[in-house]
Amino acid sequence: VQKEGGFETLKGDVVSVVVGHDCRNNGRLYAETVAKVFAANGIKVYLFESLRPTPEVSFAIRHLSAQGGVNVTASHNPKEYNGYKAYWEDGSQVLQPHDQGIIDEVNKVSMADVKMSGNEHLIEIIGGELDYDYMQAVKTVMIDQETILRQKDLNIVFTPLHGAGRHIVPMCLRSWGFENIHVVPEQMVIDGDFPTVQSPNPENAEAMTMGMNLGTRLNADLVIASDPDADRLAIVCRNDKGEWTIINGNQTCMMYCYYIINNMKKLGKLRPDHYLVK
């Protein structure tokens, strides 16, 4: 991985990676193991102190000028799974041709050659300060704060489905100006078994049941859910009859696009060379 990533060309420079994990069973153990292997092989590691959303891991890679990163997660898949997401220096997941290049290099290495411990001074624990920097960065992408402030009392129910969105999502919503945020207490408990849902995919209607039930009791306007690593959101809103309606991913994306384009146009920020990529 070091060779394929171009890390070997950075002689004299400190090579670093960011390592995170979500709520999956044994996620912390796996993340610490990943960090120890990197450190043992001479790579500096920024290891999150506890579970964090995938987008924050991506942000940290760029913010800390790291050469790559790893998040231990199985995203929205069933509880039996865990996984290893690899990231490039730009904070995005590794794509072609680098993905195959990394595998080719991995296949050249035997387990006996892999250093598993040592150099643990190269592991630096990160946490709260990155949360603050991440929230500040999120605020910079706000297009029109006045629009939000006019809706600051929007009644919102949020659930992380036992996952990594537990703290950061409500914090970000409040930092943007929303004042009426409620959470589903049973699903704020970090648990890799996801005991309150059949599957932790927020796009499955069943996973939204507890959120909608609380929303009904509180007469909420919106229910928002994030998946275990908080890189996927589902939204439920009320239709013109006051009934809950689940907005699918495509619909959500189109609403985002409509809002962004119209507000950028209104604020004079839309240029002729702007375009959307699907």
Regions found by a protein language model. Name each.
Residues 82-209, 214:
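Gly/Ser/Thr-enriched, mixed-charge loops and adjacent short helices
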Residues 7-81, 179-235:
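N-terminal small/polar loop signature for handling phosphorylated ligands or for N-terminal nucleophile
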Residues 3, 63, 175, 259-264:
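Active-site catalytic microenvironments for nucleophilic, acid-base chemistry
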Residues 33-41, 64, 85-93, 171-179, ...:
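A glycine- and small-aliphatic-rich helix-loop capping segment at beta-alpha/alpha-beta transitions
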Residues 2-11, 138-149, 264-269:
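Phosphate/pyrophosphate-binding loops at sites that engage ATP/ADP/AMP, CoA/4′-phosphopantetheine
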Residues 70, 75, 82-103, 233-262:
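Glycine-rich phosphate-binding loop of actin/hexokinase-like ATP-binding domains
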Residues 12-17, 39-44, 147-155, 219, ...:
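Short, surface-exposed connector motifs at secondary-structure boundaries
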Residues 49, 109-130, 239-278:
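Proline/glycine-rich low-complexity loops and linkers
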